[in-house]
Swiss-Prot record:
The gene is tsaD. SUPFAM superfamilies: Actin-like ATPase domain (SSF53067). This is tRNA N6-adenosine threonylcarbamoyltransferase. Fe cation binds at H113, H117, D302. It is an enzyme of class 2 (transferase). It comes from Mycolicibacterium vanbaalenii (strain DSM 7251 / JCM 13017 / BCRC 16820 / KCTC 9966 / NRRL B-24157 / PYR-1) (Mycobacterium vanbaalenii). The lineage of its organism: Bacteria, Bacillati, Actinomycetota, Actinomycetes, Mycobacteriales. Binds 1 Fe(2+) ion per subunit.
Length: 340
């Protein structure tokens, strides 16, 4: 079965094509992405209207490239990110996917963007066993129990304020590094000393929810430090901030795995591309005797391949097609894999 999927939840226009084998394996055939990030940089963040217009302009060419790369003229299924995400951006991708589904007369599946991030990993590491999922991106930070990609996902905890990626962008802006800030801040932090400045670790007290996150206090602490220490090394500030984020994320994820008796940790989402998060997670998983799975950086950011993978796993588990009047849902919860 050939599955073509459209991703348009934010500022990347993605079209992915995957094949679902009779044995349940999912093989990537094409992964084409067009990003409008450069158009948003001067505004310091994603502008929804610009993102929607960029999707309209990029979707056709991206679709043609994906079909050519895969050597496919007509898929057996069309899927699309139905949510969460920016309302206008979602609408463009969903409308296009429905149109292709109707024109090709093939089933349509409306699936969850966040589940897609988890499903991207199978292209690098094969079938996913029962796992603790740490999903970290610009808009989301969730700790999840994933029994399989075809079963309902259980949310253990999430951020009570800022997402991890949002905190990265805000600190990068504070340091004058521009937008998007994640990659630039990561590079700067490698030049600094993570022990030079110790920033607070939110939601780590004995009475705090062990699976919840908070990055607002950390963001404020960094801002106050920079204001009161103008002579401080930017690299040290970046390294101290990054260490605080990676410390909390990995400590809570490993704790959840131990609490639930799960031996695999999957880290997914855009922040999963961060070098210190990957390094510290590797160290802590090795110490705990756990298996760590993180997709290659290309598959951590938004793309259509991950949506094709998640749709394939839902189909393999018996999911029925979505109706063509299924509406996009900007606030779709992570526990709802599909809009049926």
């Amino acid at each position: 079965m050939i599955i073509l999927a459209v991703e348009s939840s934010c500022d990347e226009t993605g079209v992915g094509i995957a094949e679902l084998g009779d044995d349940g394996t999912v093989t990537l055939l094409a992964d084409e992405v067009a990003s409008s990030v450069d158009e948003h940089a001067r505004f310091g963040g994603v502008v929804p209207e610009i993102a929607s217009r960029a999707h309209l302009e990029a979707l056709g060419p991206t679709m043609r490239r994906a079909l050519a790369t895969a050597g496919v003229s007509k898929p057996d299924v069309v899927a699309a990110t139905i949510g969460p995400g920016l309302a206008g951006a979602l609408l463009v991708g969903v409308a296009a996917a429905k149109a292709y589904s109707a024109a090709w007369q093939v089933p349509f599946y409306a699936v969850n963007h966040l589940g897609g991030h988890l499903a991207a990993d199978v292209f690098d590491h094969g079938p996913l066993p029962e796992s603790i999922g740490l999903l970290v991106s610009g808009g989301h930070t969730h700790l999840l129990h994933v029994r399989s990609l075809g079963e309902p996902i259980v949310e253990l905890g999430s951020t009570v304020d800022d997402a991890a990626g949002e905190a990265y962008d805000k600190i990068a802006r504070l340091l004058g590094l521009g937008y998007p800030g994640g990659r630039v801040l990561d590079e700067l932090a490698r030049e600094g000393d993570p022990a030079a400045i110790t920033f607070p670790r939110g939601m780590t007290g004995p009475r705090d929810d062990p699976y919840a996150f908070s990055f607002s206090g950390l963001k404020t602490a960094v801002a106050r430090y920079v204001e009161s220490h103008p002579e401080a090394s930017q690299a040290d500030v970046a390294a101290g901030f990054q260490e605080a984020v990676a410390d909390v994320l990995t400590a809570k994820a490993v704790r959840a795995a131990k609490d639930l008796g799960v031996s695999t940790l999957l880290i997914a989402g855009g922040v999963a591309a961060n070098s210190r998060l990957r390094e510290l997670a590797g160290q802590r998983c090795a110490d705990a005797g756990m298996t760590l799975r993180i997709p290659r950086p290309r598959l951590c950011t938004d793309n259509g391949a991950m949506i094709a993978s998640f749709a394939a796993h839902l189909i393999a588990a018996g999911a029925r097609p979505s109706p063509l009047d299924a509406a996009s849902d900007p606030g779709l919860p992570v526990v709802q894999g599909q809009v049926a």
